[in-house]
Amino acid sequence: MKVTLIAILTCAAVLVLHTTAAEELEESQLMEVGMPDTELAAVDEERLFECSISCEIEKKGESCKPKKCKGGWKCKFNMCVKV
């Protein structure tokens, strides 16, 4: 009887510790609300400008499609599109 009780209490303690650790990990991986939005907006504007300029330059001889924007973005319709 004592062994069963000890086993149940041990399992409960392990479960609580595991759940707490999982919650802490999840909280550490969450994005902060305020700052990243403004950073993303600035990056998007920069990519749009960069792509528009490269498209304008390349349109003089060939199509814009072979030119790719940096970081997984592609130039399409004179704008950067996420690939």
UniProtKB/Swiss-Prot annotation:
InterPro entries membership: Hwtx-2-like
Signal peptide: 1-21
Protein function: Lethal neurotoxin that blocks neuromuscular transmission.
Source taxon at top rank: Eukaryota
Entry's family note: Belongs to the neurotoxin 12 (Hwtx-2) family. 02 (Hwtx-2) subfamily.
Any one of the GO CC terms: extracellular region
Keyword Signal attached: yes
Tissue: Expressed by the venom gland.
Name used for this protein in its record: U1-theraphotoxin-Hs1f
Subcellular location: Secreted
Pfam families to which the protein is assigned, alphabetical: Toxin_20
Annotated source species: Cyriopagopus schmidti
Any one GO MF annotation of this record: toxin activity
Proregion positions: 22-48
Disulfide feature: 51-64, 55-75, 69-80
UniProt KW keywords: Disulfide bond, Neurotoxin, Postsynaptic neurotoxin, Secreted, Signal, Toxin
